[in-house]
């Protein structure tokens, strides 16, 4: 019951899930539907630093969903589109609403969709850069949340952060559940 009542521990569980999955990971960028978090952990999985951006939807899963709609394609198709870009068209708007308007204008002008998509990925990667640096990411980082499955974003983060994005062997959306199960196991819970 205590485990079920422990609301607000999702980030703790994600951190624990990542640590159980790959103890070498020292930095996490968690990109969910509504916020972006940077989490630095030490060798035993203890949180050293935490940073969060929940003030703007730009840079979140919801933002990617609206961009995919603007491109009239699935989220999976959009996530991979930027990988074929030869150039990047920068997205200058910092607000999700203005960014969507900017993207629609660029599409209307006939700009290459893959280059616009690369600009969107780069824009989000820059927001992730801020969270990762605030949290203290240095050598490598892993991604959790649904956006961790976005290959274009992973490549953009590697480019912006100039560090390796470590792929986890387990679904990155399951890190919270895995961490909660590990927490229950450590506490001797029969959950």
Name these PLM-found stretches.
Residues 1, 38-43, 50-52, 64, ...:
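Short acidic, glycine/serine/threonine-rich loops at helix termini
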Residues 1-13:
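Single conserved hydrophobic/aromatic residue that forms the stacking wall/gate
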Residues 11, 157-178:
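Conserved phosphate-binding/catalytic loops in two-lobed NTP-binding clefts
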Residues 25-46:
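Gly/Thr-rich phosphate-binding beta-strand-loop-beta motif of the actin/hexokinase/Hsp70
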Residues 44-87, 182, 186:
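Glycine-rich phosphate-binding loop plus the immediately following alpha-helix
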Residues 99-132, 173:
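Adenine-nucleotide phosphate-binding core of ATP-dependent small-molecule kinases
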Residues 132-133, 137-160, 172-173:
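Glycine-rich phosphate-binding loops at beta-strand->alpha-helix junctions
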